Amino acid sequence: MKNLIQFMTRVPIKGDFEKAREEVWMLPLLTPLTAFIPSLILYLNIPLKNVLSILSLYWVIGLLHLDGLADWADGIMVKGDREKKVRAMKDVNTGIAGTFAVVMILLIQVYSLFSAPFYSIYLAELNSKMAMLLALATKKPLGEGLGKYFMDKLTTKRVFLGGVLYALLLIPILLYDPQSIFALLGLVGGIYAVKISLDNFGGLNGDCIGAVGEITRGATLLILGVWA
């Protein structure tokens, strides 16, 4: 688990990158770590809790996935064939589509927390991690890179075990508030992002996986914010 923590978060822990892909099925298990501080901020109801909660979240998980969302959006929005879209996604310069996507996902998260319950960031992170795991489970890599690197070691058994972890981490919140079951709808956003990626690029790379995680978290918070 420490290897996955070292790669997927900014927590200062030593890990082996080569072993991280052996632990990728444990992605949902990162949620208590990544969502603890943001959830605590919301629970304590301190001033500017919405902004501070999101800032603390990215302080823990870093900006890698957010950067992936920007690249993904640039590729999705460009007109042309798959080759042109992939080239736009891999361009080191962020375009207007990428900037717009990042700004929108941040605004959605911050403003959703005005009405969403304190545990919503936990559910959003849990969904985000599960959606990323499901994206990797497609086994449809886009060339060589991080996407293929993690897909290669992800078996059906490991995906199932990841699903079990997801369920076990979800149950306590469902017992606390049965209406939180609606958070599951947030996964639809991630699944749709996977479909868009496959339709536009023909596969998934690290940018696509990061975008799936960000979109799923934003969709979950939006649903919980509206439902509340």
Curated annotation (Swiss-Prot):
Pathway: Cofactor biosynthesis; adenosylcobalamin biosynthesis; adenosylcobalamin from cob(II)yrinate a,c-diamide: step 7/7
Keyword Electron transport found: no
Origin: domain of life: Archaea
Enzyme class, broadest EC rank: transferase
Major location (coarse): membrane
The keyword Cell membrane belongs to this UniProt entry's keyword annotation: yes
Keywords: Cell membrane, Cobalamin biosynthesis, Magnesium, Membrane, Transferase, Transmembrane, Transmembrane helix
Catalysed reactions, semicolon-separated: alpha-ribazole + adenosylcob(III)inamide-GDP = adenosylcob(III)alamin + GMP + H(+); alpha-ribazole 5'-phosphate + adenosylcob(III)inamide-GDP = adenosylcob(III)alamin 5'-phosphate + GMP + H(+)
InterPro entries named among the record's database cross-references: CobS (IPR003805)
Gene Ontology BP terms: cobalamin biosynthetic process
TM stretches of this protein: 24-44, 50-70, 96-116, 117-137, 159-176, 181-198
Names of the cofactor(s): Mg(2+)
GO molecular function: adenosylcobinamide-GDP ribazoletransferase activity; cobalamin 5'-phosphate synthase activity
Membrane topology: Multi-pass membrane protein
EC annotation from Swiss-Prot or TrEMBL: 2.7.8.26
Subcellular localization(s) per the UniProt record: Cell membrane
Known role: Joins adenosylcobinamide-GDP and alpha-ribazole to generate adenosylcobalamin (Ado-cobalamin). Also synthesizes adenosylcobalamin 5'-phosphate from adenosylcobinamide-GDP and alpha-ribazole 5'-phosphate.
UniProt family annotation: Belongs to the CobS family.
Listed name of the protein: Adenosylcobinamide-GDP ribazoletransferase
